[in-house]
Structures are given as structure tokens and as C-alpha cells.
Amino acid sequence: MTDQNETQDTNPVTTRRGVRSFVLRQGRMTEGQKKAFDRNWAKYGLSRDNGMIDPREVFGRDNMLNLEIGFGMGKSLADMAEAAPEQDFIGVEVHLPGVGALLKEVESRGLENVRVYSIDANDVIDLCLPDACLDRVMVFFPDPWHKKKHHKRRLIQPEFVQRIRHKLRVGGILHLATDWENYAEHMLEVMSASEGFANTQEQGGYSPKPDDRPITKFEKRGESLGHGVWDLLFYRTN
């Protein structure tokens, strides 16, 4: 049986130095997650060792390709993949319990249109995905790093957005969502100033929640407490 700590020791989560947008928590996979991981990683898992992939070869077809960065426990990604079998989905998550949970969902639902990386999204972008291969990139509820001294750790930064841009086809969508108002304002400021992107909202500002973005249990809980959620949808113009 695969040992999760050994997996990330022999295949480091990131090759990048400097500020990280994530902290590796010490949580361990449950027995069910470990078993799902061991049964399914060979089929659904991707790694840096695969190098620059050809999505058409990975999925055996040339369909709409989505990338979700930081899928958490994976239920929303599984919901989207199940609801859109004609689309393909690549998920990225550094926390192995989430990877195990997603693989359990993928197996139980019989999904064939999902593949998974368990490394830093920066490495996936730089080392694994060819330019202009993605139709949509989704970053839902990333860590807001709410203390001002930690804002530099926020994933959505001008340099990161430009690297995402090159992986999107022209017309492709970058969809961001957060339940932290200050981060929403930061995202809108970054995206509005980003070369090669335009807001899908003609008047600028935030977007209504698209029907195909699942509502998470945390989002439902937040809504019941009166918390807001902000969606931003920008498309690549050039």
C-alpha cells in the first residue's frame, strides 16, 4: 500500500523556491481514501514525471478541457465532471486526503473524464501543460491569507495570472470565486489590470454565480450566516 508521506518525499510537492500560496497540513488519509488512492492513482494520477502532456492522448479525445486548482476534498470537481461527461477535467490539489477523497468519488461514480495532479499548481502550469490547451481554469475559494503581512502568499497575483493566460486558448475563461470580500477586491483589481484579459461583465465588477459551479457545504453554511460569495469570470483576449 502506498505511504502518503513517502509519496511526497520521493516526489516533492513543488520545485519552486520562494513564497508559497499553500501550507502542507499534517492530516492523513483515511483508510477508505488510502484504498481509493492505491486502486486508482495509476489510472487517474498524473505527475511531473509525465512531462508536458498532450491532453488528447491523456483523455483519448479532443473535448473542452477544464483545470481546477485547489479542489479541496474533490466533491465539487466530481459533481462538475459527472454533470458534463462531454468535457474533461484536470484537478490539482497538494493535500493527499483531498486527492484520496476525489479518487473515491471518481471510482464510485464511474467517471472517466477526470485526471489528477498532487503537486504545486505552479509546477503543473510551468512543466506539464502546453500553451493554449485549456478552455477554462477554475480557482474556487483559495486560501485568503487574510492577514495583511500574508497577502503576498495569495495565489492570485499578476505574475501567476499571466502564466495562466498562456495556458488558456484565446476566449478561454478564468473563473475565480471567494467568500472573503477583501480577497474578492484584490482579485478584481489584479484581473482588471491584467494584460490579455477582459471581464465577461460588460460593466465590469463581479459575475452572477454560473449554474455549473456547484455550491459547497461551506458556501451553504456561509450563506445561512449572511456571508457573501464573489465570482469573477474573465476571458483571454489575446
Curated annotation (Swiss-Prot):
Class of the enzyme per the UniProt entry, highest EC level: transferase
InterPro entries the record matches: SAM-dependent_MTases_sf, tRNA_(Gua-N-7)_MeTrfase_Trmb, tRNA_methyltr_TrmB_bact
Amino-acid positions noted as binding S-adenosyl-L-methionine in the UniProt annotation, renumbered to this chain: 68, 93, 120, 143
EC number: 2.1.1.33
NCBIfam families, A to Z: tRNA (guanosine(46)-N7)-methyltransferase TrmB
This protein's encoding gene: trmB
Residues binding substrate, per UniProt: 147, 179, 216-219
Function: Catalyzes the formation of N(7)-methylguanine at position 46 (m7G46) in tRNA.
Active site: 143
Pathway(s) it belongs to: tRNA modification; N(7)-methylguanine-tRNA biosynthesis
GO function terms (MF aspect): tRNA (guanine(46)-N7)-methyltransferase activity
Family the entry assigns: Belongs to the class I-like SAM-binding methyltransferase superfamily. TrmB family.
Domain of life: Bacteria
Keywords, alphabetical: Methyltransferase, S-adenosyl-L-methionine, Transferase, tRNA processing
Catalyses which reaction(s): guanosine(46) in tRNA + S-adenosyl-L-methionine = N(7)-methylguanosine(46) in tRNA + S-adenosyl-L-homocysteine
Any one GO cellular component localisation term in the record: tRNA methyltransferase complex
Keyword tRNA processing among record annotations: yes
Name of the featured protein: tRNA (guanine-N(7)-)-methyltransferase
HAMAP family: tRNA_methyltr_TrmB
